[in-house]
Amino acid sequence: MASKKGNRIIIKLRSTESAHTYTTTKNRKNDPNRLELRRYDPTLRRHVIYRETK
């Protein structure tokens, strides 16, 4: 028997200024839209905006 899908899914966050990617989870129920977070980019050595990709 298959288990039901939970509300948490794994997503990728890609930097808007470089090719760096973070992996995180989000709750489908609380955040139905695409995430946009300000995170540290080690390639640029500063904080930039990361957007959720498919």
UniProtKB/Swiss-Prot annotation:
Disulfide feature: none
SUPFAM superfamilies to which the protein is assigned, alphabetical: Zn-binding ribosomal proteins
Taxonomy, superkingdom: Bacteria
One record GO biological process: translation
Keywords: Ribonucleoprotein, Ribosomal protein
Family the entry assigns: Belongs to the bacterial ribosomal protein bL33 family.
UniProt protein name: Large ribosomal subunit protein bL33
The species this protein was found in: Roseiflexus sp. (strain RS-1)
Gene that encodes it: rpmG
